[in-house]
UniProtKB/Swiss-Prot annotation:
Site (Stabilizes the basic form of H active site to accept a proton): D94
GO-annotated molecular function: peptidyl-tRNA hydrolase activity; tRNA binding
Signal peptide: none
Source species: Wigglesworthia glossinidia brevipalpis
Gene transcribed to yield this protein: pth
Its job: Hydrolyzes ribosome-free peptidyl-tRNAs (with 1 or more amino acids incorporated), which drop off the ribosome during protein synthesis, or as a result of ribosome stalling.
EC number: 3.1.1.29
Catalyses which reaction(s): an N-acyl-L-alpha-aminoacyl-tRNA + H2O = an N-acyl-L-amino acid + a tRNA + H(+)
Site (Discriminates between blocked and unblocked aminoacyl-tRNA): N11
CDD domains: PTH (cd00462)
Similarity comment text for this entry: Belongs to the PTH family.
Broad enzyme group: hydrolase
Cellular component annotations (GO), alphabetically ordered: cytoplasm
The name this protein goes by in its record: Peptidyl-tRNA hydrolase
Locations listed in the record: Cytoplasm
Length: 191
């Protein structure tokens, strides 16, 4: 599968990097590290990026450096500038509805309650279709405030599990690009 753009949804990195809601940016940083690349800041358009060759294709790795609810504007501008179709994107984000340690690909994504995903639809239009990689962070226990939960760091135990999950996701992204989505899903979705 050809992915020209892989985006890790994020709030401003300097303020929120280690939080649950910035799992997408964790993923991009881990992926850049795998390819021994350092992200470059585009100050004019508020995002970090780097180009990496995965298999036979170059993919642009991006972390928006703005608030989650406006990530879509940055992504839209990038796709317009580089002539990337929405179905050539993989959007990586946290997911409250998946337990910590679980991740899922979703192809031809069409809706979500995630603010970053809503922002993409707002910028691209409701008919936009793209691919996602959802990384589970679980829900807070005892009905704690969701926003507080998202904007706090995971426990040390959760962090270890999240990092293991991201490592597995990166291997599966390689399979997705180099082989096919069915093979990647079989590996990622296997318990």
């Amino acid at each position: 599968m050809k992915l020209k753009l892989i985006v890790g949804l994020s709030n401003p990195i300097n303020l929120y990097y280690n939080t649950r809601h910035n799992i997408g940016s964790w993923y991009i940083k881990f992926l850049a590290k795998k390819y021994k690349k350092n992200l470059i800041k585009n100050k004019k358009y508020c995002f970090y990026y780097i180009d990496v060759k995965i298999g036979d294709y170059y993919s642009k790795l991006v972390i928006p450096d703005t608030y989650m609810n406006v990530n879509g504007t940055i992504i839209y501008n990038i796709t317009n500038f580089y002539k990337i179709y929405s179905n050539e994107m993989l959007i990586v984000h946290d997911d409250l509805d998946l337990d910590t340690g679980i991740a899922r690909f979703k192809f031809n994504h069409k809706n979500s309650t995630h603010n970053g995903i809503k922002s993409i639809y707002k910028s691209f239009g409701a008919k936009c279709i793209f691919n996602t990689l959802r990384i589970g962070i679980g829900r807070p226990k005892l009905n704690k405030n969701i926003n507080s939960y998202l904007l706090n760091n995971p426990s040390p135990k959760e962090e270890i599990l999240i990092k293991k999950t991201i490592t597995k996701c990166i291997k599966c992204t390689d399979v997705l690009i180099k082989k096919n989505k069915d093979h990647a899903m079989n590996i990622l979705h296997k318990k």
